[in-house]
Amino acid sequence: QLVTETVTFEDATLNTSGILTGEKLAEEVTGDTGTYKEYSGTFYTSGTASFQCYYSDQWGSPYTAGFTVSNNTNMETPGLGDQYSVYAKGGAKDSKKFAVGYYDSYNASQGKAGAVPTVTFSKKVNPLNIWISNSTYAFCWWTLGEGDMGGTIAPPEKVDAILSMRGYADGTLKKEVAFKLVDEEKGLVVDEWTNVDLTPLGWVDKIEFHFVCENVNAPAYFCIDDLTVATELNY
């Protein structure tokens, strides 16, 4: 018998900035820059799904990658300072909370698994669908051309920015579902929550979210909500 479950993020406890990161799970480590706090792993669990993140304050201020749960909906402010906002008035289907993903290829290459936005499952599931939108940071970067430091540059030429959702089972890549956050051919930047079919992934125990774009300066950010999966009862 198949049952479905949906991750809505509505039960997440957020801090005063309206986000949930791996900060409270971080432990002291000692590196070349001295002692700092760091965490890479699961920071939020809902049903069978566990979401991964990377957190560090090595450079004096909090740094996050992978997933962050958020309720930030500032659609006006460009730049990295607004990295936790979705370009929408709320989560999918008028909800309050959602997750922001940041694909940090550098820290992932350094063995920080949480730097790749990843969902692991406690048993095999068949993903059905997920809602996806751009973050405000990414949307403004593509449409306004605002630089990180507040300097205005011309909006970049629109090229495909693809969110590659890769399903794994027992460590083996099975299938991939691709969604265009920016569509070069249509000249469009996604500006609303969009329902994406994940059934081609089949039965998996992990989904990795990779950001793929030929413009290496493009913000590797995206937002997700309402991930629905099917699983077998007592599987």
Could you describe each region identified by the protein language model?
Residues 122-129, 203-204:
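Extended extracellular/luminal ectodomain segments enriched in beta-structured repeat modules
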Residues 2-113, 122:
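N-terminal targeting leaders for non-cytosolic proteins
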Residues 16-18, 135-140, 216-218:
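Short catalytic/ligand-binding loop motif for oxyanion handling, primarily in non-cytosolic enzymes
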Residues 141-163:
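Short coil-to-beta strand junction motifs in C2/discoidin
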Residues 107, 114, 128-139, 144:
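Secretory/extracellular carbohydrate-interaction modules
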Residues 118-121, 176-177:
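Long, positively charged low-complexity segments
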Residues 157-235:
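Terminal, low-complexity interaction segments
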Residues 30-37, 155-165:
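Short, structured protein-protein interaction patches enriched in aromatics and acidic/basic residues
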